[in-house]
Amino acid sequence: IEQIIGSTTDFASVIASCNGVDAVIHVAARPNIWSGTGEQILKDNVIGAWNVLQAAEEAKVKRVVLCSSDSVIGFTVMSGNLKRPEYLPIDTSHVLRPTDPYALSKQISETMGRSFFERGNIEIIALRPVFVLYEEMYGEVKARAKDPSNYKGPAVGGPSAAGGGPLWHYVDPRDVASAFRCALEVPVLPKFECLFISASTTLAPNPTIERMSAFSNQEYEIRRPEIYINNPFAPLYDLSETEKVIGFTPKYDLRHLLY
């Protein structure tokens, strides 16, 4: 496989990578709110996404799959900036309220994706993964589950503290790879879409609705109560739209790590 080493902020490197290919998956970015200053995150992520989209269009690439984030909703891990959802489960019609530089960079990237799609020269879709839980984080997840109130992490040698926000959302990297493959292989994308990618459960010790109500001290409008009746630990996000559009359903449930 040919490899081209460069930066997405360097258009020459990006166009060289796009020439002669049918599709592009754009994942390269500063990956979270801790990966740089606000200026650095916005500069690298926004310019990088623009260069990928512009280069793909010029190279006549047929499809681009953008990696966005569930943080565009405003459910951020930045202290003091979390926006509570207006209803549950959160679907693709939910208002976007990014409150940190990373989330804002992803919303801008989605908007650019829609703009390029509307030009009519290329198919574009954006996927919004939650916290990607790699195997080297399993020890941290177990440590947090044993003592949720006092866990600070990293406690047992993991690369960072266990993530996923207040609901302990996660998705297995194998499911992430599968979702991106589904987005590449679905025959037609008739419109621009932004789809949530998550496991079918959270890693929180208590059911989702109970935890959300206690966390925010309020009740929520539950638009699809059957989701939480059938699966009390279902994520905040409606995954049915993802299945409908690209045929993806998560396979890996890691709640066994809690016991």
Residue ranges and their predicted role:
Residues 51-99:
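Conserved Rossmann-fold NAD(P)-dependent oxidoreductase catalytic core, especially the SDR/UDP-sugar
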Residues 46-52, 61, 105-113, 173-176:
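Conserved catalytic Lys-bearing alpha helix of Rossmann-like short-chain dehydrogenase/reductases
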Residues 43, 78-124:
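Catalytic helix-loop patch of NAD(P)-dependent Rossmann-fold dehydrogenases
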Residues 177-239, 244:
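Mid/C-terminal beta-alpha module of Rossmann-like enzyme folds, strongest
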